[in-house]
Amino acid sequence: MNEKFHRIIFIIIAIAIAAVMFSLVGDYGSSIAEDEYQITQSIQLDRYYKSFGSDTSILQSSHPMYSGWFNALTVTMSDVFSKFEIRSVRHAMNALFGFVGILFAALLAKRCRNWRTASFTMLLLGFSPVIFGHSMFNLDDIPVFATFAASLYFAKRLADHFPKPKIIDAVFFALTSSLSIAANPDSSLIVAVALIICIIGLVAQRKHNEIKKAAIRYSIFAVCSLAVIFGIVILLIPQGISEWLGSFSPNAPTRILFEGKLFWTDLLPWYYNTKMLVMTIPAAVFVGMLLALGLCFVKKTNRAEIITFLVISVLAVLLFSLKSDTTGIWQHLLYAEIPLYIVSAIGFDMLVESSRTKATQIAGIAIPLLLMVMPAIHIFRCHPYSHIYYNEFTGGLSHAFGRYELENYGTSNREAAQWVIDNGKYNLSGNQLFVATRSEKAGKHYFGEYKYEVSIVETRWAERANHIWDYAIFPVTGIEPEILASKYFPQKNTVDTISIDNVPICLVLQRIDTCDLYGRGYLANNDVQNAIELLEMAVYNDPTNESAMINLIDANLRINNKDAMKKWIDRFLEIAPRDDVGNYYNAYYQNITGNNDEAERISKEIIEYNPRFSLAYMFLSMVYTLQKRYDEAENIILSTVDYDIYDEQAARQLVRVYNAQQKDISEAELSYYDYASKSYDRRGKKELAEKYKRLYEETKNKQ
C-alpha cells in the first residue's frame, strides 16, 4: 500500500482521536491544585502580561508556575468565551494542546520513517490512558508535552534540511523551545537534543562536499536560536531567572503512597520517577521498543533516530530524578515519554515492513492494535478517571491499590460533591449542611451554587473526627496503607464509593453519630470521664477512627491510667502500625514506664519513616538530655533544619540542652547558625546559607 493511502488512514485516526478527546473533556473534574491556586495565579499572570509588567501581584505567589504563559492564555480565552465557566475553557484548551502534542509526535515519526509509523504513533499516544487523561485537566504538564513534541519536530526538520537549514524551521524551533522551557525549565533539554540531532545529521553526511559550510550555517542558527529562546523566556517569566528557577523547588511537599509507604514528595527514592513511568506506560509501547531495538540492527535502518530518542528519554528522567530539589511528581515528566512512543511505533512499522506476505503484514498491523485494546477500553470504562492507570505488567489498579497513589489529583471531588447535592439529607446543625473535604477551596467551587445551604470544612482523613460535618468527601490519598488494606475499609458509614475497575478512589462518608466530636469537646474542657465514655463509643461505631483513639490515649494519660493508655495504643497501631502520632505516644509510654531503650528505638523509627514529624525529634532530644548524652541531644534537634522544621519549639529544646550543660545561650545560637549555614549550602540554598553564615559571624564577634 502506498504512502497516499497511509496518509488518509493517518488523517482518519487523527480526526477520530480529536473527536473523542473533545467529546469527553467536559466530564472531567478539576484538580485540587487548580482550585486552590492555579486559577488565581493564572489571573495574576494574565494581568502582568496585559499591564506590560506594571501589575506585579503575581510575584506574591509562592507556587511554581508550571505552564504559566498557557494558564494566562486560558484567562484571555475565557474572557472571549465568557458564556462558559473558566474551568471548562481551561480544560478544552488543555485537550487541544494534548492533541497538538500527539499530532506533532506523529508528524515527527513520519519524518523518521513514513505515514504508517505516524499512524502507529497517533494510536499509541492517543489511546495511552495517562496521556489521554492528563490532556483532559492537567494544565501543568500537557502544555510542556505539546511544545516539547513540536520542538523535537522542528529540530528534526533542521537536521533533515542538511546542508541548508531553513530559517522558518529555526524560527519555529526557537519559539516552541522557549514556550516549553518557560512552561517547565527541565525541558531545556530540548536545546541539547537539537544539538545532538544536528550533529548526527552532520556525521551521517561527513562525506558531503559542503560539510564545512553546513557546520558554519548550523552554528549560526544555533547561536541565533539560543538568543531568541533566552529572550522569549525572559519576556514570559515575571521574576528574575534565579527566582524563577527557585520557584520550581518544592516549597510545600506532601506525602504520597509509593511501594506501600508514605513518602514526602521531596524525599522519594531516586528511582521513583523511572518506576512510575514504566508502570503507567501501556505494555504495547515496550513491545514496540523491543522490536525497534532488535530490528534496527538487523535491517540497519533508523538506528540513529532510535538511539537518539532513547537517549533523550533516559537523560530527561535521570536529570529530573537526580535533582536535589525535585518535587518527585512523575507527571512532570510526561514530555519525556514522547520519544519512547515514537521508537515503539518505528518498531511496529519495521515488523510490518519485514513481513513477506500479505497475511503476515496484516498480523504485524494487528499486534499493536490488539495490545492497545485494553488501554483504550480503560479510557472509556474508567471515564472520567482514565489518567488513573497501571499497565498489564503491574497487575492493574487492583494490585496498585494500597501500594501506589491513585487519586492524588482529586478530580473525583466533582462526582462526590454532586452525590451530596443530590442525596444529602442528614443535617447536624439544623441550619447548614456541613461538608468536610481535603481542600476548602475545591469544596467551595463544587458547592458554589449552594453557599448559603452548605458550609465547607477542611480536614485530613486522620483528623476527620475532630471537626463538625454531616458528610465528608475523601479521595483515596494520604491514608495509611494498612488502613486501606484492613477489613474496616471502606468504613461502614460510607454512603457512596466512586470506583474504577472495582477499586475505590473516593469515599463519601455520612456522620452517623457525634460521640467523637463531643468526646473531644469534653476532653478540651478536661472532663476526662465523660470524654472517655463518648470516645469509646465512637471507636465502637468506627474501629478505624484514628482521632478518637488518639484522644482516648491522651485522656487516659491525663488520669495516669497507663494500662488503658497501652490498650488504646495497641488498638491504634493494629490498624496503623507506622502512624507517627500513634508511635509517638507509644514511645512516650515506654519512657514513662522506664523502658528508655525501646522509647529511643521507636522514636528513631518514627523519624526514619516520617522525617518531618517534629515531636519525635523533641522527645528524643529530651531523652538524650536526661541521660546526659548532650552531643546526641544537640545533633538530633539540629537535624530538624535539614527538613525545614526547625521552629520555636526546637529552639527552646536546644536551649534546654545547653542549660543542662550550664553553657551560655549564645553558644546554642552559634551552634544553630553554623549548622543551618552548612545545611542550606549542602542543599543548594545559597542565599539562606549566606544569611546564616553572616549571623554566625556577627554573633561570634559580639562575644
Labelled PLM ranges:
Residues 121-126, 153, 177, 181:
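Short helix- or helix-capping micro-motifs
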Residues 6, 11, 105-127, 164-168, ...:
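Transmembrane-helix signature of polytopic, membrane-embedded enzymes
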Residues 40-51, 63-68, 72, 79-83, ...:
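Transmembrane-lumen/periplasm boundary regions of multi-pass, lipid-linked membrane glycan transferases
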Residues 399-703:
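C-terminal luminal/periplasmic domains and tails of membrane-associated envelope-modifying transferases
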Residues 134, 140-145, 180, 189, ...:
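Hydrophobic/aromatic-rich transmembrane helices and adjacent perimembrane loops
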